[in-house]
UniProtKB/Swiss-Prot annotation:
It comes from Stigmatella aurantiaca (strain DW4/3-1). CDD domains: EEVS. NAD(+) binds at residues 91-94, 123-127, 147-148, 160, 169, 187-190. Gene3D superfamilies: 3.40.50.1970, Dehydroquinate synthase-like - alpha domain. Keywords: Cobalt, Lyase, Metal-binding, NAD, Nucleotide-binding, Zinc. Belongs to the sugar phosphate cyclases superfamily. EEVS-like family. It catalyses: D-sedoheptulose 7-phosphate = 2-epi-5-epi-valiolone + phosphate. GO terms for biological process: antibiotic biosynthetic process. This is 2-epi-5-epi-valiolone synthase. It is an enzyme of class 4 (lyase). GO terms for molecular function: 3-dehydroquinate synthase activity; metal ion binding; nucleotide binding. Zn(2+) binds at residues 202, 267, 283. Its EC number is 4.2.3.152.
Length: 406
């Protein structure tokens, strides 16, 4: 569970200026549990026993799991202790208006400074509820219960909250740690194949720039001779490995005072690909295209070897993730994306590219990316994506008939 305390500090007088000094110490737990809402599972009860709670849940999770979740609350908490709020979860609903709606619902339920917000759903719900928790009464506790693979390996371990504004993704938000994060992989059994692929993009990301064993575990799982499909449980060494590597990368730099972040691999061109497509591309799909283009650029610059570049494309291909969008990935559009990121990251693009599988490196400035090299990478990805489109037919990436559980 999270703790925040002020340590050390003091006050000094310098002429007419009073200087205040304080330091905050942050900590939070990411729990991986089975059967989180089984009647005999005590974890949520122990965390929330005496708290008043507003439980925010996505419509699809409410439809698929709502009765079981509500029964848990009926069993363990008094009726006046909690209230449910169903939140719309499209990118167009990831807005300050919905954050204010959460705050208004919390006020109407008389949630005080000791109250709790509980977020149950995918990344959009978690981001909005976290933002609301960070500003309601200047900050109350909240618990994250991610129900998507992206949520469990990425959003679960970080402290960022945010919503979209003026056509920009996550333009406003805060850094605010959850009181606790509760992962239950049972939720993934009702996740649609597309959402599973999006989560896999984030796991592949960590394998490519931080840990080659994550990448090879996924290769062994999805590629011949094993060739497992998405309905098979993912290798836990890859899932937990991605979470551990994510925490290791985030922990020394939770508030992003250093804007050189390996975890930003796949998150440079992808922001433009998502927004310009009107969010027709899901986040993980945009990340996959970004990773493919960044790997191709690294290869064009003579950094990433040809064999490893082919391995990267092969894994993305067999999982069923897109690697290129001809309509969106023009040289002008991708160069514009770099310029926008240059502003966002303090006039340094800090573009992460794979030097080899398991090791990332930075191209810090715009001048480190020759426009002609980017153009060559885009032309090559255009050709390779045609091969990818043909090979994907009948691959392990074919859609599975699953209910939507995002």
């Amino acid at each position: 569970m999270a703790h925040i305390k002020v340590v050390g500090g003091g006050t000094s007088v310098r002429g007419s200026t009073l200087q205040v000094s304080a330091q905050a110490d942050f900590g939070y737990g990411v729990h991986n549990e089975e059967g989180l809402f089984d009647p005999g599972q005590p974890l949520l009860l122990e965390l929330c026993r005496d708290a008043r709670m507003l439980v925010c849940i996505s419509p699809s999770v409410d439809r698929l799991h709502g009765e079981r979740i509500r029964q848990y609350f009926r069993t363990h908490f008094a009726p006046e202790q909690y209230r449910f709020l169903v939140l719309s979860t499209s990118e167009s609903n990831k807005s300050i208006e919905n954050v204010l709606r959460i705050c208004e619902a919390a006020k109407a339920f008389w949630l005080d400074r000791h109250g709790l917000l509980v977020a149950i759903g995918g990344g959009i719900v978690l981001d909005m509820v976290g933002f609301a928790a960070s500003i309601y009464r200047r900050g109350i506790r909240y618990i994250k219960v991610p129900t998507t693979l992206v949520g469990q390996v990425d959003v679960a371990v970080g402290v960022k909250t945010g919503v979209n504004l003026s056509g920009s993704k996550n333009l406003i938000g805060t850094y605010y740690p959850a009181y606790a994060t509760l992962n239950d992989r049972g939720f993934l059994s009702t996740l649609p194949a597309r959402e599973m692929r999006c989560g896999l993009a984030e796991i592949i990301k960590m394998g490519l720039v931080c840990d080659p064993e994550i990448f090879t575990a996924l290769e062994a799982h999805f590629l011949p001779p094993v060739s497992r499909h998405l309905e098979h449980p993912l290798p836990q060494e890859a899932v937990l490995g991605a979470m551990v590597r994510m925490i290791e990368e985030l922990q020394p730099n939770l508030f992003e005072l250093n804007l050189e972040r390996l975890v930003d691999f796949g998150h440079t061109f992808s922001m433009s690909l998502e927004t310009v497509s009107g969010y027709a591309h899901a986040h993980g799909e945009a990340v996959a295209m970004d990773m493919a283009l960044s790997a191709c650029l690294s290869n064009e610059l003579g950094i990433l070897g040809e064999a490893e570049f082919e391995r990267i494309l092969a894994l993305l291909e067999v999982v069923g993730l897109p690697v290129f969008d001809e309509a969106l990935c023009s040289v002008d559009a991708m160069w514009q994306a770099l310029m926008e990121v240059n502003v966002h990251r303090g006039h340094r693009i800090n573009l992460v590219i794979p030097a080899r599988i398991g090791e990332g490196m930075f191209l810090h400035r715009l001048e480190d990316v020759p426009r002609d090299a980017l153009a060559r990478a885009i032309r090559r990805m255009s050709v390779l994506s045609q091969r990818h489109a043909v090979a994907a037919l009948g691959s392990a990436g074919e859609p599975l008939e699953r209910a939507s559980g995002a």
